[in-house]
Amino acid sequence: MRIEEELKLDYSDVLFRPKRSTLSSRKDVNLNRTYKFKYSNQEWSGIPIMAANMDGVGELSLAEGLSDFDMITCLTKQHDVKKIKKFKKIKYFYKNIALSIGI
């Protein structure tokens, strides 16, 4: 057995100080961001929050719902390509899905 004697930090050792803001409400915050990808020269605009494959998250129905808010859904590699292509509104939210392949 190995005993580690180094000092370890805990949650009680960390303090986050909020930044001062001129906003009167959290509803006034704009979460939309635009990213330009260096090597493809493509841009993506939306809210940089991703739903990934965790216990049923990352399904086509979730992608449709999150796309209304310009959020990204990572679909699993188990999805059949034919099923993705046949999904009715795929063109509407296609820019907000990513395929995870698990390399």
Where would I find each of the regions flagged by the language model?
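Active-site entrance/lid segments in N-terminal catalytic domains of soluble metabolic enzymes
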Residues: 1-103
